[in-house]
């Protein structure tokens, strides 16, 4: 494996568990331990534990912290109460996507921005440039990515596995997109514990100091063993998020896509009362209406759609697949794809070009999967 790839503090433990390691966003990460399908089903039916320490964390604090976040975020962080978490996007002036992020409001003037691993350096430079241009000096911006590790415990049994180990929080009272501080898990002090995730299931994300994560990982795996908890890799993380229609940077969103065509308009607040980068372009797109739309596709003919495969209507290529795979939950071959709005209605028949063959498919409702366990 390339020596320049970064490793999380759990690298040796992944190898001990038999993980297959792959490069991802500049990191050497576990793609699977047993099998993607087995790990995927564990999360849907019981629970899975993910090492997502490759994600980036920026702390913004000080009197102008909110001003900076409002400038770079499409969402309205002024409506974010202390102890809550908000999904948002950062956009370029033309409305395309720099990254999608989570904003954590830890205190009155203290926030975290959690960014995608492969975008950490780009995002850091982009936010710093925005700050300089706006002359926002009454704040501190700190890259804490190297000192923070992150585990995601996901699935319907996540709460019952975690609660006996946790002191300082009653998990049944922690709402989705809420956070708790001063929580200890199996003797490990956490920095932040939130009811968030990227699987479409109920679950928690646990932020700890990098030096504490190995003890937490082992304690959680041991505690959840009887309930069917499995360590899970990036393969299952991708199929889980994809079934729930959660976007992945470089697939559904990128500097070639805007949030409105991606179906993320709920996180774009054009009337939040302050200007933000990309606002004018997004206002124009909203007024005119997007020309294309992200849709779900289900294969009728046999074949597995993959990213980049063309989508055609009546033999003419009109769009392309952003993510495609066999769905372990639905046991069908499905895809997300961008197509012109005229061909985006549910039930529309399309073809996916797989290895030169036009295979029949249809546009279906999304998300492909909604958890019966989510709160």
From Swiss-Prot:
Keywords: Aminotransferase, Transferase. One of its GO terms (cellular component) is cytosol. Signal peptide: none annotated. It is an enzyme of class 2 (transferase). Its EC number is 2.1.2.10. The keyword Transferase applies. One of its GO terms (molecular function) is aminomethyltransferase activity. GO terms for biological process: glycine decarboxylation via glycine cleavage system. Gene3D superfamilies: Aminomethyltransferase beta-barrel domains, Aminomethyltransferase fragment, Probable tRNA modification gtpase trme, domain 1. It catalyses: N(6)-[(R)-S(8)-aminomethyldihydrolipoyl]-L-lysyl-[protein] + (6S)-5,6,7,8-tetrahydrofolate = N(6)-[(R)-dihydrolipoyl]-L-lysyl-[protein] + (6R)-5,10-methylene-5,6,7,8-tetrahydrofolate + NH4(+). Pfam families: GCV_T, GCV_T_C. The glycine cleavage system catalyzes the degradation of glycine. NCBIfam families: gcvT, PRK00389.1. The glycine cleavage system is composed of four proteins: P, T, L and H. Belongs to the GcvT family. This is Aminomethyltransferase.
